[in-house]
């Protein structure tokens, strides 16, 4: 948006032939995050969904951490590395206690995406592994000063975005991430948050891992 075609004009004025629109579809796919942020004022959103063959996202005892095998988990971590932000919900953090770090072959990467936690009522435990590595942003519907302070002491940033029914405004959250120049968001959340994002039309791509 800072250039807005002026670069092409400058090249032409310098006597350089410039063709535009070549391989437009392929170029858009390569830059889907940036293009979505420029045209829709939000990042490209990719949601990971792991399910059993019969369509469930958790076991009968409520466990959801290891539905899929190591190959699927390693593939999912690859997408974490490509993202500008990893988005999850408080239910997932409380149930699975994930670190949600970007790793390749088990090695922690030097560049860690921003980790974003949707937690409407600040129920998260500051001792969760979520806060162990990288920058973290906790998004609530209404800030509680005491709870917020405990999270800030763990290095987290707090953002209050009130939506309907006392929940976080997810559309406003994506606009805020776009303002922070996040091009791609990788969602690793439970059925509630992922389903709500799909319902609102905020998911551009689904990564479905199905375990027999």
Located regions from the model:
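Short beta->alpha connector loops at strand-helix junctions that form conserved
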Residues: 22, 161-162, 210
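Conserved functional loop/turn residues at catalytic and ligand-binding sites
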Residues: 15, 181, 201
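Zn2+-dependent cytidine deaminase-like catalytic core
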Residues: 1-28, 142-144, 157, 196-198
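Residues at the N-termini of beta-strands
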Residues: 1, 85, 184, 204-205
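Conserved beta-strand edge residues that scaffold enzyme active sites
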Residues: 25, 165, 191-192, 212
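Active-site ligand-binding patch in enzyme domains
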Residues: 34-36, 40-53, 57-183, 192-195
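Flexible, gly/pro- and Lys/Arg-enriched active-site loops
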Residues: 199-212
